[in-house]
Amino acid sequence: MTKNHKLWGGRFESSLEKWVEEFGASISFDQKLAPYDMKASMAHVTMLGKTDIISQEEAGLIKDGLKILQDKYRAGQLTFSISNEDIHMNIESLLTAEIGEVAGKLHTARSRNDQVATDMHLYLKDKLQEMMKKLLHLRTTLVNLAENHIYTVMPGYTHLQHAQPISFGHHLMAYYNMFTRDTERLEFNMKHTDLSPLGAAALAGTTFPIDRHMTTRLLDFEKPYSNSLDAVSDRDFIIEFLSNASILMMHLSRFCEEIINWCSYEYQFITLSDTFSTGSSIMPQKKNPDMAELIRGKTGRVYGNLFSLLTVMKSLPLAYNKDLQEDKEGMFDSVETVSIAIEIMANMLETMTVNEHIMMTSTETDFSNATELADYLASKGIPFRKAHEIVGKLVLECSKNGSYLQDIPLKYYQEISELIENDIYEILTAKTAVKRRNSLGGTGFDQVKEQILLARKELKAE
């Protein structure tokens, strides 16, 4: 007589040591799959009944039992046990306690291999949809903010040095476009997630006359996997998500880095709401951008989850291996981390104050109008390379005497070229510099309006 009381214990003469059992158990984290596991089981037993693999009466009893468990789960009344290893065994054990041995018929024509794969496809499909909705909110917030700041002028940077004046709205629309591509990547990810592994069984399919198309429809998947080995053994849809999540977090992190700089004493371009700031335990004056810093910091954690799963998968032979238990925690963690990061970013932008005057003033005491002068000279017939050299020397001279290009007398400019006129001073203003950059996709005010108009159409279409 066997001493192993596991649902799979028939072949064993002894039980696992408790500490070994704890090492192998996954219920501490895969219980997040509980609602998806019960949903998949409901579809599976419906199919078993309709194909007469089990009787309609048995299918009805099992469905009634699953409904009881679903209600208890929603009410927070289900208790899971480590002795049942994982969420699948826990649900089956709880179902058996509710309806008796007939619960054992639920696992007909099914393995935990296709069961867990189905659960994860359902989970990730659900979370991808939620994440895209949150990105839609973030992108809408960016467009609204950009529309309010089309005419707000700020320094544009390269190498963290003042480069050329730009519209703050233009800067915000750059991030809108990045997050739009992030959304598109998640949409493509959905294509590879919206597949049903259910019915693939352990690896080779089943001898029972199952209807995989029926369970696919019941679970609202696009189509079933066409190869049972592929269905149970790959996790590329999760790796694809973790890769997309890493790119998305990189974009959030870059934006947070700028927000952290902008709200510093040295910049003062923005003021964050108290809701997204914290203080210091010793320095009373501090208002720290902790939420932006945490998003920046948690980006590395999402990267780590990607590399962890890639490493797990790199040498696995087909089909299922226990290594695949390591596919879940990183996925759960990344879903939760990215989701809250998107929400915080959107709300942080909605509640921050933009100090327009400081942004504008910072473009009046720098040399970010140097390109305007070079372009002006080139328009008067001076070769651009020569104009570049002339302006570079003027910048050097101004730097030495504490003046700026707009301070140089017209008489001095006309010594460079008699074609230079008084309009040079209007051209050297930051607002004019921005307005004149009206090439497609440029920072010119009219171009920013076009970008916003296009974005509004994209958002409406979604």
UniProtKB/Swiss-Prot annotation:
EC number: 4.3.2.1
Matches recorded under InterPro entries: Arg_succ_lyase_C, Argininosuccinate_lyase, Fumarase/histidase_N, Fumarate_lyase_CS, Fumarate_lyase_fam, Fumarate_lyase_N, L-Aspartase-like
Annotated Gene Ontology cellular component terms: cytosol
Molecular function via GO: argininosuccinate lyase activity
GO biological process, alphabetically ordered: arginine biosynthetic process via ornithine; L-arginine biosynthetic process
PANTHER family assigned to the protein according to its UniProt record, in alphabetical order: ARGININOSUCCINATE LYASE (PTHR43814:SF1)
Name used for this protein in its record: Argininosuccinate lyase
Organism this protein belongs to: Streptococcus agalactiae serotype III (strain NEM316)
